[in-house]
Curated annotation (Swiss-Prot):
Subunit structure: Heterotrimer of UreA (gamma), UreB (beta) and UreC (alpha) subunits. Three heterotrimers associate to form the active enzyme.
Annotated Pfam families: Urease_gamma
Known EC number: 3.5.1.5
Name the record gives this protein: Urease subunit gamma
Domain of life: Bacteria
PANTHER family for this protein: UREASE (PTHR33569:SF1)
Length: 100
């Protein structure tokens, strides 16, 4: 099986996001890479579910709270950008200040 560099990147995001989700479910706080991966995964899955870019950008500011991440993480993540595949093509989704 051949995977393009983009497909490999997405698989790494998914793997990190699944680990982050397990940690969230155990009540642990996410670090910076885990938070970015988890947010990115939510965008990818939302696009796959047929949600619009604007819906994802709006919802993306409510997925994680300051209480769910380690101290200092919200200040490090000013925006998350992820290319996601929508029914009408690939689009860039930007989450501005996603952890509030």
């Amino acid at each position: 099986m051949y995977l393009s560099p983009q497909e490999k990147d997405k698989l790494l995001v998914v793997t990190a996001a699944l680990l982050a989700e397990r940690r969230l479910n155990r009540g642990l706080k996410l670090n910076h890479p885990e938070a970015v991966a988890w947010l990115s995964f939510q965008v990818l899955e939302g696009a796959r579910d047929g949600k619009s870019v604007s819906t994802l950008m709006n919802e993306g500011t409510r997925w994680l709270t300051k209480e769910q991440v380690m101290e200092g993480v919200p200040e490090l993540i000013h925006e998350v950008q992820i290319e996601a595949v929508f029914p009408d093509g690939t689009k860039l989704v930007t989450l501005h200040n996603p952890i509030r």
